[in-house]
């Protein structure tokens, strides 16, 4: 919920069993699981919880504090990618991508900040980083060098909110519908389909 991590046993999906509530921070927004860690985004920062030794009782392993802002987060083996955006109830003023090195979870360090328009959801598949940048549309970067992201493709003309990239297909939630993009060829990333949303 807004300030706690609620742990459930879902081995029986018909009857989920509540196990524990772990206090995290005020205004928790997103949870991103990667390997044996949970990366939790809040208005004030990113919190890292270890679930390797005891999945039913997550233990705080580290955090990274940033300026107050709405905060989606994803991660890979080496870095966390955090988008901050303004113009919401989060009361922040930053519109940026923060890349944080995870070699020391207790003291995660900022690698670089990239200024954006109004970044929200993001996803990563291999070296491709997908960012929904609000009215600037979908931006796709080569992230092989996190200190020097290279923009490969931008799909403008749509207002994007969230993206899931998996197995060469990116599903993008936008203001006017659900878009599907094929990125099997990075030199020819293209739209596959769109399902429109009614404003009624």
Indicate residue ranges for each PLM-predicted region.
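Short glycine/acidic-enriched loop and turn motifs that connect beta-strands
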Residues: 2-4, 45-46, 86-91, 136-137, ...
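Short loop/turn segments that connect beta-strands within beta-propeller blades
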Residues: 10-14, 51-55, 102-106, 143-147, ...
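A short beta-strand motif characteristic of beta-propeller blades
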Residues: 14-22, 56-64, 106-114, 147-155, ...
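Repeated scaffold domains used in trafficking and secretory/extracellular systems
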Residues: 25-34, 66-77, 116-125, 158-167, ...
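Conserved beta-propeller blade signature
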Residues: 37-40, 80-82, 128-131, 169-172
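Beta-propeller blade signature
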Residues: 95-101
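Intrinsically disordered, low-complexity segments enriched in Gly and acidic/Ser/Thr residues
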Residues: 120-156
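Blade-level signature of beta-propeller repeat domains, shared across WD40, Kelch, NHL, RCC1
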Residues: 164-200
């Amino acid at each position: 919920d807004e300030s706690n991590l609620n742990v459930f046993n879902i081995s029986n999906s018909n009857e989920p069993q509540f196990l524990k509530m772990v206090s995290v921070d005020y205004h928790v927004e997103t949870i991103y699981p990667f390997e044996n860690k949970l990366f939790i985004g809040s208005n004030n920062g990113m919190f890292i919880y270890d679930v390797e030794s005891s999945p039913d009782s997550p233990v705080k392993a580290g955090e990274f504090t940033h300026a107050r802002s709405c905060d989606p987060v994803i991660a890979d083996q080496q870095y966390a990618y955090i988008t901050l955006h303004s113009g919401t109830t989060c009361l922040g003023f930053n519109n940026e991508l923060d890349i944080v090195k995870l070699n020391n979870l207790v003291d995660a360090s900022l690698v670089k900040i990239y200024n954006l328009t109004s970044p929200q959801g993001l996803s990563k598949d291999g070296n491709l980083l997908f960012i929904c940048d609000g009215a600037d549309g979908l931006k796709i970067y080569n992230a092989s060098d996190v200190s020097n992201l290279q923009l490969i493709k931008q799909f403008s003309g749509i207002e994007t909110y969230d993206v899931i990239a998996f197995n060469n297909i990116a599903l993008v939630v936008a203001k006017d519908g659900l878009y599907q993009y094929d990125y099997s060829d990075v030199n020819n990333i293209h739209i596959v389909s769109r399902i429109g949303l009614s404003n009624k």
